[in-house]
Amino acid sequence: LQVSLHASKIDISEELRNNLYEKNSNVILTSATIKVEESFGYFLQRNGLTENDNIITRDYVSPFSYQDQVKYFQYGGSKDITSDINELSDLIYHVHKTFNKRTMVLFTSVRMLENVSKKIKERLGGKKIPLFAQSRGASKPSIIKGMHSNENALLFGTNSFWEGVDLPGELLEVLIVVKLPFDVPSDPLIKSYSCLLYTSP
């Protein structure tokens, strides 16, 4: 029997100040989600900074026009489609068939990804539509390279594909989100963060 204990600090503001800000003359922090209710205050507080520090904040409007460049569709069925692998697979298949564009499907479960991938492969049969499914044997760079090379490719991803994937323009035109990735509420770290948020002024 082997037992291991793991610890993680909830508040790392002091570490950031001592090891990052005070050891560097210039630090640039960027994100699309830094502001809360049009204020940088919460981000500054959580990251060891105050209004008294020599800070310059800037807010830039995104040049991306959602109204002109995005069409949003939501499944309107009466049940949770993720509970029916066959129906979910049919929906993904028909969406890809309708648009016939490079499509990425994001999952929160590896098992669901594998099950749907198997069903889609059966539906595709001999069609020349490449399907790249994230698995233990496929690397992220090789999957992205495959998307570059095939105009109507299907990409099934989870975990690392939820962020840090750059497929601009025609390299990715259809995105299907099977289920939003919420953290497990019972996770000790998540519970600690939640308590901290509720007790913060």
Regions found by a protein language model. Give the residues of each.
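ASCE RecA-like P-loop NTPase motor cores
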Residues: 1-200
